[in-house]
């Protein structure tokens, strides 16, 4: 009886977790001195707010130039298109990440079309800024309309130049790196005038407000996030932006837009005082970004202002190399402290077997093996409780409706027989955080996207196309249930729920990613094996 109740408890806990997650989804110092002593940043960021940053929505018809006028950059990882008006990144395709498994079309992250506006904008504002809401955007010149990272070339520089009316030259330099999704976006200001110039860099990500494509089975997040010196990682949804504009002063920091598996992020200099801001523009665009330190450029001096932009998959190693907290966009929730070592172990197994399906099997075997002592304690406790059932039934007849005497007698019996009535469910409660953490690792790991296993499973991140594994998983649950016959004293309602549990779980898992179903199926098979071994050992001790 205790075994069925515990299986029922697992089911209820898991379904409750999914429902809770879906509810969560729905509510869902001074800058350092520069190289030139005649060119210094101001002691603080500007007191102005994000209204200083130009609103691209109002200039959208002018900004969306013909495709032939865009500057195209090709690297081994990225296809980038830059608008010469402002130098905004208006298109990014990830070469090695396909849109669909059976097509050669690359996954497009940033794009600017009639229906979608998801771009990375940056510029210079302030007294002598070349981009502002009043002056409009700078029109840059480029030596070429197409740049390609050649074989044997590790970096590719794409310079855009603009000469202001006062004679000062502004160069917007994009630097691309082989094997990376990071782009260095730097401004070089050559002040050939006899007046001091004052500029402030900003970078923002503009995103059409769009509902998340998550479901109860795949609770993913689409929206913004940011980091400050005091807050390493915090989501800031489109609803949050509509309620309140973000305005956080910080040393360093970053601002990002997230979706399942992919992220775009602006990372300003870590040693500069920056302001992380957000807004909802008149055209219904969600914006999040940074405004950096104000720089004073003396006559005859040259100043470089740095920033980094990441546009690509949520690869933890690549993200950590840019900012120590940027890898937190791979969000494992409140059990991150368990999920991180599980992820590292999964990566280790993948390096050994070079197959993500086999790696999932190995980590499932490892986790189940580590939890075996708890599992054994659970079944031992349940066996002892079953042996006490005749005595408990006798007590029930003896004391009738006198619950106080019945409870006292039960406690004395448990103490005498050295049985913990909670011993059957406590191990399950201890195991659930590990199972949930592993669930999140498999759900959040971009490495599983389009990763094949074997036979008909060509993508572990999507559902089994023929529903074979969910059905096998349901059968394994049915076998586990039958290995422990239902006690006649079990409540009729519990019996009905137990009988339908394999069916309910099978229906749930029909739409789960194949990697998650594989984990659960292998876990059930291991549990069946462990159960047979434990029962054999208990039988030798006279426990049934």
UniProtKB/Swiss-Prot annotation:
The chain crosses the membrane at residues 6-26, 345-365, 423-443, 460-480, 503-523. It is a multi-pass membrane protein. Residues 30-56 are annotated as: Disordered. It is found in: Cell inner membrane. Keywords: Cell inner membrane, Cell membrane, Chaperone, Membrane, Protein transport, Transmembrane, Transmembrane helix, Transport. GO terms for biological process: protein insertion into membrane; protein transport. It holds the Pfam family 60KD_IMP. The keyword Secreted does not apply. It comes from the Bacteria. Residues 36-48 have a biased composition (Low complexity). Its main location: membrane. GO terms for molecular function: membrane insertase activity. The keyword Heme does not apply. GO terms for cellular component: plasma membrane. Belongs to the OXA1/ALB3/YidC family. Type 1 subfamily. PANTHER family: CYTOCHROME C OXIDASE ASSEMBLY PROTEIN COX18, MITOCHONDRIAL, OXA1. HAMAP family: YidC_type1 (MF_01810). Interacts with the Sec translocase complex via SecD. Specifically interacts with transmembrane segments of nascent integral membrane proteins during membrane integration. Required for the insertion and/or proper folding and/or complex formation of integral membrane proteins into the membrane. Involved in integration of membrane proteins that insert both dependently and independently of the Sec translocase complex, as well as at least some lipoproteins. Aids folding of multispanning membrane proteins. This is Membrane protein insertase YidC. It comes from Shewanella sediminis (strain HAW-EB3). The lineage of its organism: Bacteria, Pseudomonadati, Pseudomonadota, Gammaproteobacteria, Alteromonadales. The gene is yidC.
């Amino acid at each position: 009886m205790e075994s069925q109740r515990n299986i029922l408890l697992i089911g209820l806990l898991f379904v409750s977790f999914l429902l809770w997650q879906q509810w969560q989804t729905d509510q869902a110092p001074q800058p350092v001195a520069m190289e030139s002593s005649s060119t210094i940043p101001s002691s603080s960021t500007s007191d102005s707010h994000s209204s200083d940053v130009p609103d691209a929505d109002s200039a959208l018809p002018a900004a969306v130039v013909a495709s032939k006028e865009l500057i195209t950059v090709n690297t081994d990882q990225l296809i980038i298109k830059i608008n010469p008006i402002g130098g905004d990144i208006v298109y990014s395709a990830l070469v090695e990440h396909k849109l669909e498994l059976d097509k050669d079309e690359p996954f497009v992250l940033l794009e600017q079309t009639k229906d979608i506006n998801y771009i990375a904008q940056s510029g210079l504002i302030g007294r002598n800024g070349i981009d502002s809401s009043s002056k409009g955007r700078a029109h840059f010149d480029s030596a070429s309309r197409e740049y390609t990272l050649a074989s044997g070339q590790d970096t590719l520089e794409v310079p855009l130049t603009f000469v202001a009316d006062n004679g000062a030259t502004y160069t917007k330099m994009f630097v691309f790196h082989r094997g990376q999704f990071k782009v260095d976006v730097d401004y070089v200001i050559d002040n050939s005038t006899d007046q001091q110039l004052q500029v402030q860099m900003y970078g923002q990500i503009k995103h059409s407000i769009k509902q998340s494509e998550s479901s109860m089975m795949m609770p993913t997040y689409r929206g913004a996030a940011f980091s400050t010196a005091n807050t390493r990682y915090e989501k800031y949804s489109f609803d949050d932006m509509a309620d309140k504009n973000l305005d956080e002063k910080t040393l360093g920091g970053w601002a990002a837009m997230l979706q399942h598996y992919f992220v775009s992020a602006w990372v300003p200099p870590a040693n500069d005082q920056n302001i992380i801001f957000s807004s909802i523009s008149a055209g219904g665009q969600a914006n999040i970004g940074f405004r950096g330190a104000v720089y004073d450029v003396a006559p005859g001096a040259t100043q470089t202002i740095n920033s980094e932009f990441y546009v690509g998959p949520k690869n933890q190693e690549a993200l950590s190399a840019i900012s120590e907290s940027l890898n937190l966009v791979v969000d494992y929730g409140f059990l991150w402290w368990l999920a991180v070592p599980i992820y590292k172990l999964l990566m280790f197994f993948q390096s050994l077997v070079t197959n993500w399906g086999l790696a999932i099997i190995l980590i499932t075997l490892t986790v189940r093996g580590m939890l075996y002592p708890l599992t054994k304690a659970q079944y031992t406790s349940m066996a002892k409780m079953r042996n006490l059932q005749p005595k408990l039934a006798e007590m029930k007849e003896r004391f009738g409706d006198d619950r106080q005497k019945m409870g006292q007698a039960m406690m004395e019996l448990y103490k005498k027989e050295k049985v913990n009535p909670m011993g059957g469910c406590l191990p399950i409660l201890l195991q659930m955080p590990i199972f949930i953490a592993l669930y999140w690792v498999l759900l959040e790991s971009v490495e599983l996207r389009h990763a094949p296993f074997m036979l008909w499973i060509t993508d572990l991140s999507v559902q089994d196309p023929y529903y074979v594994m969910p059905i096998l998983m349901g059968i394994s649950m049915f076998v586990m249930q039958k290995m422990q016959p239902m006690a006649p004293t079990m409540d009729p309602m519990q019996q009905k729920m137990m009988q339908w549990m394999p069916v309910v779980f099978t229906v749930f898992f029909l739409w789960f990613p194949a990697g998650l179903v594989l984990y659960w199926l292998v876990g059930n098979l291991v549990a069946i094996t462990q159960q047979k071994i434990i029962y054999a050992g208990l039988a030798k001790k006279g426990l049934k």
